[in-house]
A protein has these predicted regions:
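Membrane-anchoring hydrophobic helices of lipid-metabolizing enzymes
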Residues: 2-94
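Non-catalytic C-terminal accessory region of glycerolipid acyltransferases
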Residues: 2-5, 9-12, 149-264
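Catalytic core of membrane glycerolipid acyltransferases/transacylases, capturing the structured
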Residues: 41-67, 76, 90-145
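A generic structural signal for well-ordered alpha-helical segments
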Residues: 73-74, 134, 155, 189
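Short gly/ser/thr-rich secondary-structure transition/capping motifs
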Residues: 75-83, 142-146, 208-211
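Secondary-structure boundary/capping positions in well-ordered alpha/beta enzyme cores
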Residues: 80, 115-116, 140, 159, ...
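Alpha-helical membrane-embedding segments
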Residues: 81-99, 129, 151-156, 196
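Thr-Gly-centered strand-to-loop micro-motif
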Residues: 84, 120-121, 166
Length: 264
């Protein structure tokens, strides 16, 4: 048996174990949501402090919970995580706009950034595993409307970072043109007069893509790379902003897209 055949045989032999490890990791993740709902939510309600302090505490709990999940999937050999320019992710009150190749990249990002908020699907508020953490941490549902800008600007002013995927959904595996990008991130940056930090995420091989099932594992562990790119200064778009807010938002959104997808 040659080296290639031996490697293929080893992959097939390890597949049942990798499936079991994956099921364990996601069960642990779901259990964290239940624990948050049944134990931490009542405790947060009884704890003293302002609503902002309670949200901050909840986010620290979520950060540790997500960090535990990341440690589990990396220790089990399911995923490898690489972070480029890690010091950038430690900056307070940053707007981090990323592409979205995998389901778990948001989990990784929220475990890296000291304190962050994000926008989530409103449907997740109906999910037993995710409702309590979302409400406790004050994450904003995507049906919040114009109020979201006001809430996010207030969070940024308190030093809370904002993690967002301008595509609004996971990045397709095959891209022949620039994906459609929502302008909300640019609108927030222009309103708050804050730069946008593009975060280019690469995933090889791709796993947990849109409409894919978790048990369809790639042959090799997925390598997730998070690269913080140079900031995009909104002052560059100030002249356009003074003439047309909408056009400035479009141009800024396009600039973010070019940074995230330079090959398109």
């Amino acid at each position: 048996m040659n080296a290639v055949s031996m490697h293929a045989f080893r992959r097939r032999a390890l597949l049942p174990f990798r499936l079991a490890f994956t099921a364990f990791a996601f069960a642990l993740f779901g259990l964290g949501g239940i624990v948050f709902g049944f134990f931490l939510t009542p405790w947060l309600k009884m704890a003293g402090g302002t609503p902002e302090e309670k949200k901050s505490l909840a986010r620290r709990v979520v950060k540790r919970w997500f960090g535990l999940f990341v440690s589990v999937v990396t220790s089990l050999g399911l995923v490898r995580i690489e972070v480029k320019n890690p010091e950038v992710f430690q900056k307070k009150g940053a707007i981090l706009a990323a592409n979205h190749p995998s389901l778990i990249d948001i989990v990784c990002l929220l475990s890296i950034v000291p304190e962050a908020t994000t926008i989530v699907k409103a449907s997740l508020l109906k999910n037993w595993f995710t409702r309590a953490p979302i409400l406790g941490a004050g994450y904003i549902p995507n049906d919040a409307g114009p109020e979201a800008l006001v809430l996010l600007e207030a969070e940024l002013s308190r030093g809370v970072s904002f993690v967002i995927f301008p595509e609004g959904t996971r990045t397709p595996i095959q891209l022949s043109e620039m994906p459609k990008m929502h302008r909300g991130t640019a609108q927030l940056a222009l309103h708050a007069n804050r730069p946008i930090t593009p975060v280019r995420i690469s995933a090889h091989p791709r796993w947990l893509t849109k409409d894919a099932v978790w048990w369809r594992l790639p042959q090799e562990p997925m390598v997730l790379t998070f690269e913080a790119l140079p900031e995009i200064d909104v002052q560059t778009f100030q002249k356009t902003y003074n003439q047309s807010f909408r056009r400035a938002a479009v141009e800024l959104t396009n600039a973010v897209g070019r940074a995230l997808f330079p090959h398109l």
